[in-house]
Amino acid sequence: MPVEVDCTFGADGRVRVRRVRLGRPWRVVEQGRQWADADARHVLVMLDGTVHELVLRADTLTWELRELPGGRKMV
C-alpha cells in the first residue's frame, strides 16, 4: 500500500519516521527497529496499535506500508 512519510535521514543512513499519511490526515507513529537489505530500508512502526513495516524501495525511492503476518493490536 503506498504511503506518504515525513522523516529525516541521519548521516549513517538511518531513518527517523515522524508521521505517515494514508489518504487522511497525518498520523504520528512510534518507531521500532530498522534494517536495510539490497532492495530496501525497512522500518517497524506502530500505527493505530498495530505493528506495520514501512519499506523504502531502493529502485523507486517510494515508501510502502506492509502489515506483518500475524500482526496483532497492542493495548
Where are these regions (language model features)?
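Cysteine-centric segments in proteins
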Residues: 1-75
